A protein has these predicted regions:
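Amphipathic alpha-helical interaction surfaces in cytosolic regulatory modules
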Residues: 26-105
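STAS-typified acidic loop motif
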Residues: 4-37, 56
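Short hydrophobic/aromatic patches at helix-to-coil boundaries
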Residues: 116-120
Length: 120
């Protein structure tokens, strides 16, 4: 597993690239920018689209700016014929996804294995 700074680790499972957020909090603008700078090149460099699973298992708090980043990531992935799947979302954070109706925008799974299975 390759570590990418600052707050993610990357793993490959079958057809999926799994990005795990390693920090409990994603709140600062500089951290959100760093995430974008780490994830967008993966999307751009994937030939034929990327199947990206974002694993929120460690995340307890996130700012609303992260939701905007997720929408930008999603748009870029779908433009390149890939898929974005989210998993392991904390119940409190999941409530935010429900309130903002992002549960209708994103494919959300219980865990990484379920998400990866959907891609096979």
């Amino acid at each position: 597993m390759a570590a990418i700074k600052p707050m993610i680790s990357v793993e490959y499972i079958g057809k999926a690239t799994v990005v795990r957020f390693t920090d409990e909090k994603i709140l600062e603008e500089k951290d959100i920018q760093a995430l974008q700078d780490s994830i967008m090149p993966m999307i751009e460099s994937a030939s034929g689209g990327i199947n990206l699973i974002l694993d929120f298992g460690n995340v307890q708090y996130l700012s609303s700016a992260v939701l905007g980043l997720l929408i930008r990531i999603s748009k870029r992935i779908y433009e390149n014929d890939g898929r974005l799947l989210l998993c392991n979302i904390n119940p409190k954070i999941y409530e935010i996804f429900k309130i903002t109706r992002l549960t209708k925008t994103f494919d959300i799974y219980k865990d990484t294995e379920s998400a990866a299975e959907d891609l096979s």
